[in-house]
A protein has these predicted regions:
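Transmembrane and membrane-interface helices of multi-pass
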Residues: 1-190
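Active-site rim elements
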Residues: 40-43, 189, 301-304, 356-359, ...
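A long, amphipathic alpha-helix that forms part
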Residues: 57, 370-373, 412-456
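Histidine-centered active-site microenvironments of extracellular/periplasmic hydrolases
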Residues: 256-260, 452-453, 457-500
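Flexible internal linker/loop segments at domain or repeat junctions
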Residues: 403-424, 473, 498-504
Length: 577
């Protein structure tokens, strides 16, 4: 007599499905729920995170007996992406957006690691450990979600069709929208779910970079500025543009800050009548790439894409017959693959002074002084020299020699309630300003010593919030949560005796005018004596026809994101903020 053992078929379990959903939802929906509870956003983020996190159920349905392996592999990716977004929210109180990702991708991994070290704290470590522990606990509860064949294929396809294929088909074939627009809309819906915000952000970054690379490759094909005139003719001259970094004027004694952070510029201002200090210039965007796309071109907050289609300041000066130079102490990954490098390559000769593998290295801005001297001695009759500094860029203590920490441990004129770590950063920033003062003053002095015919303009690309605004707990820059200190910048003009002799002008009546750095190209054209179709004297801060207009700040690519800088609350301040 033979006996047969019948193996029972596995049954579908709602409990197993529930744990699988909870596991995948955890990585995205937790943060969206926190954002909703805080009142920062509505329910769309929760809805989309729930929907698109459910896509990870497809491999679980198709291979139920391998759920632990599948969930572990996918979970590591989701954990890393979602933890980064959660920590960003803890630090800034804002959602991790594509705009932030764009800045991260452009600044390169070395700079990103420097940001991580700046914000590394016990609080972040504890949050990360707790977050990881919950994720691991949920993973241990996973069991096979068994759906009989062929229904597992039907359910999996239904998920894929409902969330991905149907929106694409509907928008592309029924509504006749461009396929690229359809993908952009879908990516926007998927963004609240990890790790799609990283993938869509990188996709947009590559698109933007390709556009700029194309602009560089086709630079000679751009039509020159029409009806172009240079009132100075062919007389030899040298013009200098110094671009600072992360330096807000409210922390400069030159602008009334009680700590002596700019002694050399203070002395120059008192003794040299040719140095003009403008008191009311603000940047339009608190990020280097985004503001230089405006300051060095005809783009602005209302027309942010003109940098792609119209000549830049570098193109304009080459059209005027200048030999152009770019000297930078900003880190460059390669000579061609960053947006800053695209701008620099529009000049005739470049000096890349920072070759460190990591930005967390003591590579000081005094690096630019020797090549600056070399370029001053170049025999070209007409020269434009652009100098790009690291300035007071985070991490501040790397911007000055270790033995020059004048304000280390100093508690004078410090906001109340700072922790020891915050006080250290506050003082480091002032030390960085002190060293930046030496570099900028040295550039002016070296330029003056060359007995040039020309002028020098210095500004910082944007400011920096370093516990300046009550409740004194914010450091860095966040366009979605702006403070005045993120936008207030120094703006200096030094003119040589020879230039003044042939271009006599009194700027004393101009120094308090409200001005946006986004309009720089018009001021530069005015100073250089250039005119052309598109030049607008009402947008030059040194022109008698100047008209004050709204100083827009914010992300111009985000709906209803532009705001008037002058509506921002003041908080604590010094000087003209």
């Amino acid at each position: 007599m033979h006996s047969t053992e019948v193996q029972a078929k596995p049954l579908f379990s709602w409990k197993a499905l529930g744990w699988a959903l909870l596991y995948f939802w955890f990585f995205s929906t937790l943060l969206q729920a926190i954002i909703y509870i805080s009142g920062y956003s509505g329910t769309n983020g929760i809805r989309d995170s729930l929907l698109f996190s459910s896509l990870w159920l497809i491999p679980v349905f198709l291979f139920p007996m391998r759920i632990k392996i599948i969930a572990a592999v996918i979970g590591v990716v989701l954990w890393a992406a979602s933890l980064a977004a959660l920590c960003y929210y803890v630090i800034y109180g804002q959602e991790f957006s594509q705009s932030v990702l764009f800045v991260m991708f452009e600044t390169n991994t070395n700079e990103a690691s420097e940001y991580l070290s700046q914000y590394f704290s016990l609080k972040i470590v504890l949050i990360a450990l707790a977050y990881t522990a919950v994720a691991v606990l949920l993973w241990t509860r996973l069991r096979p979600v068994y759906i009989p064949k062929p229904w597992r294929y039907v359910v999996s396809f239904a998920l894929l069709y409902g969330l991905i294929l149907h929106p694409i088909a509907m928008n592309t074939f029924i509504k006749n929208k461009p396929f690229e627009k359809t993908l952009d809309n879908l990516a926007s819906r998927m963004e609240p779910a990890a790790p799609w915000q990283f993938l869509t952000g990188y996709y947009q970054y590559r698109q933007q970079l390709n556009s700029l690379t194309k602009l560089l490759n086709e630079n000679n094909a751009l039509p020159p500025l029409a009806n172009f005139k240079d009132e100075s003719g062919n007389e030899p001259r040298t013009l200098v543009l110094v671009i600072g970094e992360s330096t807000q004027r409210g922390r400069m004694s030159l602008y009334g800050y009680p700590r002596e952070t700019t002694p050399e510029l203070d002395a120059l201002h008192k003794t040299d009548p040719n140095l003009t200090v403008f008191n009311n210039v603000v940047t339009s965007r608190p990020y280097t790439i985004e503001i230089l796309q405006q300051a060095l071109t005809f783009a602005n907050e209302k027309n942010p894409d003109l940098y792609l289609t119209q000549p830049s300041l570098m193109n304009m000066m080459k059209q005027a017959g200048y030999k152009t130079f770019w000297i930078t102490n900003q880190q460059t990954m390669t000579a061609r693959n960053t947006m800053l490098t695209v701008f620099s390559r529009q000049t005739d000769k470049q000096y890349y002074m920072n070759q460190q593998r990591t930005q967390s290295a003591r590579e000081y801005d005094t690096n630019v002084l020797k090549p600056f001297q070399d370029v001053l001695n170049d025999p070209a009759p007409k020269k434009l020299i652009i100098v790009h500094l690291l300035g007071t860029h985070i991490k501040y203590k790397y911007r000055y020699p270790e033995n020059q920490g004048k304000f280390d441990g100093n508690t004078d004129h410090v906001p109340p309630g700072l922790s020891a770590e915050e006080l250290e950063s506050y003082n480091d920033y002032d030390n960085a300003n002190l060293y930046n003062d030496h570099v900028v003053a040295s550039l002016i002095k070296d330029f003056k010593a060359a007995d040039p015919n020309g002028f020098l303009v210095y500004f910082s690309d944007h400011g920096e919030e370093v516990y300046d605004t009550p409740p004194h707990k914010t450091q860095g820059r966040n366009e979605d949560n702006p403070t005045r200190h993120m936008y207030t910048i120094p703006f200096l003009l030094w003119t040589s005796e020879k230039w003044q002799a042939t271009h006599p002008r009194d700027f004393s009546q101009d120094v308090d005018r409200k001005y946006s750095l986004a309009e720089l190209i018009h001021t530069w054209s005015d100073l250089a004596g250039l005119s052309y179709d598109g030049y607008d004297p009402t947008r030059s801060v040194v022109n008698p026809q100047f008209k004050e207009t709204t100083r827009w700040i914010g992300n111009p690519y985000k709906k209803n994101a532009l705001i008037d800088y002058d509506t921002l609350p003041y908080g604590d301040q010094v000087g003209n903020q």
